[in-house]
């Protein structure tokens, strides 16, 4: 190798190293950044995937955690803030979305668990009552912040009240990650399986 080739290699390496690392994952045209921030803390994209019903693409979802986890137990136990980011891929009446939420929650929690978080389930249901339709392109975000609670956002704007119990957030996560997930192909995608 001559000096010119070595110099070219060093210049190319320096240019490559200076490029920003935008490792976004694309799910049905929706880009999920590799990192995000919740409550001032950086989170990593644990996984992202597509929610389908029959043959229809309903939404793309991404799960952000403080550190990557591959099992449901680890995800539910991970400390710090968390985020579920959902981008709608079709119009869905909020009544249908709320019904699917309730069915997913009921399928993956016991009656005792639901009774403990019933006030928060009711508040969450009120959120859907405020929005008649989730439209294609809408972004729904569910953030968990320790010592504060769960806050929902629609297109970046807060909707509904803060729901304080972590058991509620974990119950919501189990809609996608529980033993009976709403979409069996979305669960492994959110757990970062390729």
Language-model segments: residues:
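A short, compositionally biased
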Residues: 29-32, 144-148
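Flexible glycine-rich active-site/ligand-binding loops centered on an Asp-His dyad
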Residues: 159-186
């Amino acid at each position: 190798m001559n000096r010119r080739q070595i110099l070219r290699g060093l210049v190319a390496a320096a240019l490559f190293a200076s490029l920003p690392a935008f490792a976004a994952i694309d799910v049905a045209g929706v880009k999920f950044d590799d990192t995000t921030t919740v409550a001032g803390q950086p989170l990593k994209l644990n996984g992202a995937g597509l929610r389908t019903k029959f043959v229809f693409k309903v939404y793309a979802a991404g799960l952000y955690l403080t550190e990557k986890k591959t099992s449901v137990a680890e995800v539910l136990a991970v400390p710090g803030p968390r985020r579920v980011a959902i981008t709608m891929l079709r119009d869905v009446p909020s009544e249908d979305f709320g019904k699917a939420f309730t069915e997913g929650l009921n399928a993956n929690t016991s009656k005792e668990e639901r009774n403990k978080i019933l006030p928060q389930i009711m508040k969450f249901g009120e959120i859907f009552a405020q929005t008649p339709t989730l439209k294609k392109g809408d972004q729904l975000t569910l953030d968990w912040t320790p010592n504060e609670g769960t806050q929902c956002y629609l297109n970046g704007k807060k909707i509904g009240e803060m729901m304080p119990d972590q058991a509620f957030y974990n119950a919501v996560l189990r809609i996608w990650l529980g033993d009976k997930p709403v979409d069996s192909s979305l669960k492994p995608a959110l757990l970062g399986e390729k």
